[in-house]
């Protein structure tokens, strides 16, 4: 189903990019790995820039980042950079300091370059009428085991019929997300995505079905899939 853009809705996007990607075993951050002619981060930003509702992108960078300003996309008037933090939550809060009249904010991983325009549009079109926001996600297909942390023996199997893999982007009202993230920091709670902050504060974001191709590049083998999916996206 083709959904229609909503040009009057203003959204800012925050892309946390302060990580250094230890699991890739590189001497530079993985978002700057090149696939064909572009870095992973450039692919990520180009998809966000292609949507008419996204009026500004804020990239949260590591204090020692000396790669971003060398990218041509960094000179786009809609792209800003700020200093990120040691944890993802601090990088997102840094991005929320930017002055804007937008009421909504999208958070998207720097290393998810295979996001399709249609998934982005679906998230915005479906979520914009909620008061809480929503996320892209995929149903869990594998059998999930809960283990003993120490010796890794299986304790039990978790029913998967209501389990989802959380993806990004995630879209929320700006003021609500800011409030929930600050509450998480105050209470010293560990979270791995922004939706978890809303859940902690008693809110229930919507799930919007996303593509399995929207992978997060974490390990070297992920680059093979990313190159294949990007080739498909660019062809379309």
UniProtKB/Swiss-Prot annotation:
Record site: Positions MEP for the nucleophilic attack: 160, 216
Catalyzed reactions per annotation? 2-C-methyl-D-erythritol 4-phosphate + CTP + H(+) = 4-CDP-2-C-methyl-D-erythritol + diphosphate
Keyword Translocase in record: no
E.C. numbers: 2.7.7.60
What this protein is reported to do is described as: Catalyzes the formation of 4-diphosphocytidyl-2-C-methyl-D-erythritol from CTP and 2-C-methyl-D-erythritol 4-phosphate (MEP).
Q: Which organism is it from?
A: Buchnera aphidicola subsp. Schizaphis graminum (strain Sg)
Q: What is this protein called?
A: 2-C-methyl-D-erythritol 4-phosphate cytidylyltransferase
Q: Does the keyword Transferase apply?
A: yes
Checking PROSITE patterns in the record gives:
ISPD
Say which family it is in. Answer: Belongs to the IspD/TarI cytidylyltransferase family. IspD subfamily.
Mind listing the UniProt keywords for this protein, alphabetically? Answer: Isoprene biosynthesis, Nucleotidyltransferase, Transferase
Per the record, where is site Transition state stabilizer? Answer: 23, 30
Q: Subunit details for this protein?
A: Homodimer.
Pfam families linked? IspD (PF01128)
Question: A Gene Ontology biological process annotation?
Answer: isopentenyl diphosphate biosynthetic process, methylerythritol 4-phosphate pathway
Q: What is the lineage of its organism?
A: Bacteria, Pseudomonadati, Pseudomonadota, Gammaproteobacteria, Enterobacterales
One of the entry's Gene Ontology molecular-function terms is:
2-C-methyl-D-erythritol 4-phosphate cytidylyltransferase activity
Q: In which pathway does it act?
A: Isoprenoid biosynthesis; isopentenyl diphosphate biosynthesis via DXP pathway; isopentenyl diphosphate from 1-deoxy-D-xylulose 5-phosphate: step 2/6
